[in-house]
């Protein structure tokens, strides 16, 4: 019996340590965010001109209304939905443009997943439930563009990074 009590005690302490570590990583998140955004921009760099050259459309997919949602009360949900949109709808299609492109898009996706994970761990940055109308408009326009939508969305990925930065800067000022 004493050995099982010791085991339970160790498990409990490990959980407490993990919780403290998670909280500490949130304390440092605001200082690590610029580095994470630089990594996203650097990962996008090798494919940026490829996708922007393929995007022959003049209108933006990521409009000012999306940025306003990022800055408004729907910011959390807009950010969460847009990360999911890029990871599930855009990037899998973008990977079909050749092995070299696939490698870079995959790397970009991994960095975006890491950002999403860090945001979810630090609930003050991503505590949301509501739907964003602007994100729905982006998704609808993307669908209407069919295969051209991938070039449009990937070509504007740098705008998406800027919107993430605007949202996170606003959230850090409030906290």
UniProtKB/Swiss-Prot annotation:
Signal peptide, first to last residue: 1-18
SUPFAM superfamilies: 4-helical cytokines
Domain of life of the native organism: Eukaryota
Residues with attached carbohydrate: 130
Biological process per Gene Ontology, one example term: cellular response to lipopolysaccharide
GO terms under cellular component: extracellular space
Keywords from the named record: Cytokine, Disulfide bond, Glycoprotein, Secreted, Signal
Disulfide bonds: 26-122, 76-128
MF term (GO), any: cytokine activity
Localization annotation: Secreted
Family: Belongs to the IL-10 family.
Biological role stated in the UniProt entry: Major immune regulatory cytokine that acts on many cells of the immune system where it has profound anti-inflammatory functions, limiting excessive tissue disruption caused by inflammation. Mechanistically, IL10 binds to its heterotetrameric receptor comprising IL10RA and IL10RB leading to JAK1 and STAT2-mediated phosphorylation of STAT3. In turn, STAT3 translocates to the nucleus where it drives expression of anti-inflammatory mediators.
Subunit structure: Homodimer. Interacts with IL10RA and IL10RB.
Name of protein: Interleukin-10
Gene name for this UniProt entry: IL10
